[in-house]
Amino acid sequence: MAKTLFEKIWDSHKVSEINGRSLIYVDRHMVHEVTSPQAFDGLRINKRNVRRKDLTFATMDHNVPTTNRKLPIVDQISETQIKTLEKNCQEFGIPLFGLDSPYQGIVHVIGPELGITLPGTTIVCGDSHTSTHGAFGAFALGIGTSDVEHVLATQCLVLDKPKTFEIRVDGKRKNIHAITAKDIILSIIKKIGTAGGNGTVLEYRGQAISDLSMDERRTICNMSIEGGTRAGLIAPDAKTFDYLRGRKYTPKNYDDLVEKWKQALKTDIGAKFDKSFVIDAEQIVPQVSWGTNPAMTADVTESIPEPSEFAKGDSSQEIAAKIGRAHV
């Protein structure tokens, strides 16, 4: 049976299924200082250890000083969270990219830069924009603190299988310098709305997506969450494989894996998506956000819509639009 890329990744990581819910194996668990303290406390209370220390990677992320790191951290909560992660990683034997590590960085940046993120893998992190890793052909999703504890203890996660949603961006951009990846994703969210992807995983396809650099693809997948979806992904190609080659954690048999990925990690011809949306890249122009959510976006050539026009009969949206316009 023909399958989508997401369905292939899901099926290859499904451990079991009970009452319609699936137990999914997690290949990579990224941890940072903000959403992990209570999870480690839960392990202590229940006298559990970390199941796969070798597949768990911690980094200082949210509370890192942007200037002199040798100076004390002024915010007391931030300092406590950083010290707590250091303590927890030492106690549970988890590798940590601390403030003095050359590998420390924003979690969704260092994952690919270090070769931790790989095509066809499942990746979780206690951060809503974990979908960024989907740019590399991974099923990556943000999870809450209770699920962080569950993955630390079991290396698995119980999930309802999302629906599949194809976003196809056909054709080429008129000007690759003027029309950015951010313009593409804002155009999409403007059309489908911030709840358009609820209960789905997006797969971005089409010529305009293939033309994007890996950084641009990360921009697209990062903002999938703003469309209400659980995750977004793009099939890996030569750009993906070249980017990840030779990184610190890239597997030694990488070239062999690439040959397998070329054949396996793509949506089959004839595969059916539950939903589909098509947009013409040539029609996309620079976007301007005028409100308080990503759907409140207009072409740079357009006027800001009236609240009633934007809301289309939804009173809550009309109120939101009025608030949004007040900030312009």
Segment roles from a protein language model:
Residues 1-325:
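Fe-S-dependent hydro-lyases/dehydratases of central metabolism
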